[in-house]
Amino acid sequence: MGTPCHFALFELQPNFRLDLEQLATRYRELARGVHPDRFADASEREQRLALEKSASLNEAYQTLKNPPKRARYLLAMNGGEVPIEVTVHDPDFLMQQMQWREELEDLQDEADVAGVAVFKRRLKTAQDELNESFAACWNDAAQREQAERLMRRMQFLDKLTYEVRQLEERLDD
């Protein structure tokens, strides 16, 4: 996980719900202070430390601004690492995944730009619902299994959203 805690680095309390604008503002403030260019005339040791601090800051920011990564990080803070590869016993969601993938393939085959936009909005709604569900249960040890399941769903939707963006770019060409 690295030290210090990603949240402490940004002077935030560990929480799933974050003000992303506040996070970005704080990131820019901190990044200015450790940017390697500011240490161009410093000793080699100071340059290396600045580079390490900058890398740590970037990693923390990338983790906290991305809901699935933030969810995984919070779960790791609360009870140890979450296995990356596990057998998912979630037949309803597996079925939903298959339906979404088939629909995305159809949209690609048909080059349906308007359909992709509708699909993207539905994904965003599903992501928002997952985020709210996770926010409500991540800090409850009795709901750890549910929180992990939601985090895995969030990861899938994040990946699917990336694939939708790639499809949009191909259709725009």
From Swiss-Prot:
One biological process term in Gene Ontology: [2Fe-2S] cluster assembly
Domain J intervals: 5-77
Keyword Cytoplasm: no
GO cellular component, one term: iron-sulfur cluster transfer complex
Keywords for this protein: Chaperone
GO MF annotation, one: protein-folding chaperone binding
Cited function: Co-chaperone involved in the maturation of iron-sulfur cluster-containing proteins. Seems to help targeting proteins to be folded toward HscA.
Matches recorded under NCBIfam families: hscB, PRK00294.1
Subunit structure: Interacts with HscA and stimulates its ATPase activity.
Name by which UniProt lists this protein: Co-chaperone protein HscB homolog
